[in-house]
Amino acid sequence: MGSGAGNFLKVLLRNFDVLAGPVVSLVYPLYASVQAIETQSHADDKQWLTYWVLYSLLTLIELTFAKLIEWLPIWSYMKLILTCWLVIPYFSGAAYVYEHFVRPVFVNPRSINIWYVPKKMDIFRKPDDVLTAAEKYIAENGPDAFEKILSRADKSKRYNKHEYESYETMYGEGYQY
């Protein structure tokens, strides 16, 4: 009976990375992410969002260089240690890697890259930039100034609508501008 338990313990220790890897890299972060969504704190949201960004980058690198990585016998242990460092909030590993390595590349690419992409051509801009700009304008100029801009835009829209309607009356209903 003692040898059976010893053999079982040996198998567990030899395959520790295989057993602990998914728990550390997926199960616990998924649970913690759901808990973070349910709280009002933004600090834990940032922790888990940065973790998932780094997890996806690590997975992408691992899939890209799979043939090279299989030559490293300790890769699974290195990945487990790295993942533990990223996951455990006490170490703030995910925040550190994101702030020092990922953020400079994606948030301010012009400081890293030598090529130039104009702001209008940047396809990676956030869709809520308009909302952010509106909030900033309201904070600086007040809600009354914002209402004036909206009323001017509404008047302009109505004017343009009448312009299109005149084309419709001239050319028929099938006319498209």
UniProtKB/Swiss-Prot annotation:
This is HVA22-like protein a. The chain crosses the membrane at residues 18-38, 47-67, 68-88. It is a multi-pass membrane protein. GO terms for biological process: hyperosmotic salinity response; response to abscisic acid; response to cold; response to water deprivation. It is found in: Membrane. Disulfide bonds: none annotated. Induction: By abscisic acid (ABA), cold, drought and salt stresses. The gene is HVA22A. It comes from Arabidopsis thaliana (Mouse-ear cress). Keywords: Membrane, Stress response, Transmembrane, Transmembrane helix.
